[in-house]
Amino acid sequence: MFKRSFLTLALAATLSTAAFAGAPQQKTSAPGYYRMMLGDIEVTALSDGTTQLPVHQLLQMDADKVRDKLAEFYRQSPLETSVNAYLVNDGESLVLIDTGAGTLFGASLGNLIKNIEAAGYSTDDIDEIYITHMHSDHIGGLITGGERVFTNATVRADKHDADYWLSQQQMEQVPEDKRGGFKGAMAALNPYVEAGQFKTFVAGETLAAQITSVEAYGHTPGHTMYRLDAGDQSLVFWGDLMHVAEVQFDQSSVTIAFDSDQDEARKQRVDAYADAAKNGYYVAGAHLPFPGIGQLKSDDDAYDWVPVNYSPMW
């Protein structure tokens, strides 16, 4: 009797344990893309990943004040910062805006290609690539192992940025420890130059897919925003107009160490914020939390960020 009861209890315990065992944690994220329609044009935000930025050291502002401002938003420094790119499909051409960091920043970045594929495209589908500027986290994804990733694409960039970053003469005018950016730009772009797949433009030029280049010099000598117009709707791709939403939407005058011309970068940001808030169009930021698309609303001397509302496309 005791033996039978013991076996019954043991079996019950085993079944009970199996029934209430927790499911294994998956520890994976959904694919890093977000899709929306702007009029009849499809826009896909693509995540290259995130990186930790010591923004208390990088922002041109007292470090303790930066930490205090971040704390208001339950954030801290180093700040996990998104690196975003964008794909524009007007039904005739497929345009990629920026390419992420590639292999240059470690495993937390370099996810652009797999997210392009998750979004239903391949690198061979890309017709043109518009570079906002030639910092490595925007052009690193152009190559892998020294070879072109986007074999069918023409890469476009503002002439001022190309003339600066791709110039051996310009590089030789800066100290040796400041030449990494030049070398990285040359490594990423030269394979396209040699293949006849690189073309510059001047600010204000209308490019493919109803996209117009917009001068935003300051962060780099040829930093460019891109304006996409679709009927009565518009979206402006900001590039690196700003980096830290928690600080720079409240205090648009705060610059960052990456800005090559601090005064001009500040002016461009102040003007762009005011225009976006006044006209209510969408903006997309390379370092705003993914997907980085939203609108600005003025709030006295500051601005409120209104992220795009999620709208499924099924």
Residue ranges and their predicted role:
Residues 48-49, 99-102, 134, 160-161, ...:
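Active-site metal-binding loops of divalent metal-dependent hydrolases
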Residues 31, 54, 134-141, 164, ...:
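Active-site environment of divalent metal-dependent phosphoester hydrolases
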Residues 22-23, 110, 117-121, 125, ...:
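Metallo-beta-lactamase
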Residues 1-21:
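Gram-negative bacterial Sec-dependent N-terminal signal peptides
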Residues 85, 91, 107-156:
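Active-site metal-binding motif and surrounding structural segment of the metallo-beta-lactamase
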Residues 40, 88, 98, 126, ...:
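Divalent metal-coordination and catalytic microenvironments
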Residues 29-119, 225-242:
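Conserved beta-strand hairpin/beta-sheet module of binuclear metal-dependent hydrolase folds
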Residues 227, 231-314:
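Cap/insert and terminal regions of metallo-dependent hydrolase folds
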